[in-house]
Curated annotation (Swiss-Prot):
Protein species of origin: Bos taurus (Bovine)
GO biological process, one term: mitochondrial respiratory chain complex III assembly
Similarity section: Belongs to the complex I LYR family.
Originating gene: LYRM7
Main location: mitochondrion
Functional summary from the UniProt entry: Assembly factor required for Rieske Fe-S protein UQCRFS1 incorporation into the cytochrome b-c1 (CIII) complex. Functions as a chaperone, binding to this subunit within the mitochondrial matrix and stabilizing it prior to its translocation and insertion into the late CIII dimeric intermediate within the mitochondrial inner membrane.
Phosphoserine carried by residues: 60
GO cellular component, one term: mitochondrial matrix
Keyword Transferase: no
Quaternary structure annotation from Swiss-Prot or TrEMBL: Interacts with UQCRFS1.
Pfam families, A to Z: Complex1_LYR
CDD domains to which the protein is assigned, alphabetical: Complex1_LYR_LYRM7
Descriptive protein name: Complex III assembly factor LYRM7
Length: 104
C-alpha cells in the first residue's frame, strides 16, 4: 500500500475512533476533530518517506491509546461520575493471589 493510501486510511481510522470514544460528547468530538485535522494539515507538505512513516506510526499509536485507554465519565450528581466503558475496554479479570502458598 502506498504512503498516500496509508495516510488516508489513518485519517479515516482516527475519525472513526474519535466518534466511538467520544460518543454523545459534542465538545470532545469537536475538539478531537479539530486536533486531527490540524495535525494532518500541519504535515500536509511533508515529503520525506522516513518522516511520513514516523508520523504514521505516531498516529497509529494515538489511535490505539484512544481506543484502549480512554473511558467516558458522565456527571450525575455533584462530585459523582458515571463511567461508561466500551467493549474494547472490558478485559477478562484474572484472579490474583498474592499470598504465598505453604510448602508441605
Amino acid at each position: 500500500m502506498g504512503q498516500a493510501a496509508k495516510v488516508l486510511q489513518l485519517f479515516k481510522t482516527l475519525h472513526r475512533t474519535r466518534q466511538q470514544v467520544f460518543k454523545n460528547d459534542a465538545r470532545a468530538l469537536e475538539a478531537a476533530r479539530k486536533k486531527i485535522n490540524e495535525e494532518f494539515k500541519c504535515n500536509k507538505t511533508e515529503t520525506s518517506p522516513k518522516k511520513i512513516e514516523e508520523l504514521i506510526k505516531i498516529g497509529s499509536d494515538v489511535e490505539l491509546i484512544l481506543r484502549t485507554s480512554v473511558i467516558q465519565g458522565i456527571h450525575t450528581d455533584h462530585n459523582t461520575l458515571k463511567l461508561v466503558p466500551r467493549k474494547d475496554l472490558l478485559i477478562e479479570n484474572v484472579p490474583y493471589c498474592d499470598a504465598p502458598t505453604q510448602k508441605q
